[in-house]
């Protein structure tokens, strides 16, 4: 098993970057916060072992570009670990997600109807494991994906 030797965090918001910097001070390894979005990651190609994404893929403006950048910076057989919410498989729920998506985008920049699992594989990742389930809460925002994918 490998140890974490360094963490890079991407955050375009200065306010949130400052909050993350405060939290990162107690980490047992160096944390470097980068003023960038996932669509243009300021790191060398094939320089990262693992990318962790938690509740962010719904709000990235250009998801395809972001997943392409994640693939670019990951080393061969690198891992994308994700915990995300997205489009529910139930037609009645997904219709509500589609209806409410403009409101969520306007209020929180969130796209609750993205097909996260399909987007990851369409970007060229190999799905290693994935679980899909409703978590507690309103069904139109509680369908979640947790898993890991590898670069191919």
Located regions from the model:
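Core SAM-dependent methyltransferase catalytic element
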Residues: 129-152
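Short, glycine-/aromatic-enriched active-site segment of Class I SAM-dependent methyltransferases
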Residues: 91-106
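A short acidic, Gly/Pro-enriched loop at the edge of an enzyme's catalytic core
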Residues: 39-51
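A short glycine-rich, Lys/Arg-flanked "PGG" loop and its adjoining helix->strand segment in the class I
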Residues: 64-76
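A short SAM/SAH-binding and catalytic strip from SAM-dependent methyltransferases
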Residues: 49-62
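Short alpha-helix
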Residues: 108-124
């Amino acid at each position: 098993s490998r140890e974490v030797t360094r963490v890079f965090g991407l955050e375009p918001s200065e306010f949130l970057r400052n909050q993350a910097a405060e939290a990162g001070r107690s980490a047992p390894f160096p944390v470097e916060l980068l003023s960038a979005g996932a669509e243009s990651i300021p790191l060398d190609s094939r320089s990262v072992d693992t990318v962790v994404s938690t509740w962010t893929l719904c709000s990235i403006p250009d998801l395809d570009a972001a997943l392409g950048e994640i693939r670019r910076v990951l080393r061969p057989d690198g891992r994308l670990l994700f915990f995300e919410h997205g489009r529910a498989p139930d037609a009645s729920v997904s219709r509500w997600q589609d209806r409410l998506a403009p409101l969520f985008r306007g209020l929180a920049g969130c796209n609750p109807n993205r097909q996260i699992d399909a987007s990851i594989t369409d970007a060229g990742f190999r799905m290693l494991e994935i679980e899909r389930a409703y978590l507690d809460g309103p069904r139109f925002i509680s369908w979640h994906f947790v898993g890991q994918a590898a670069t191919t």
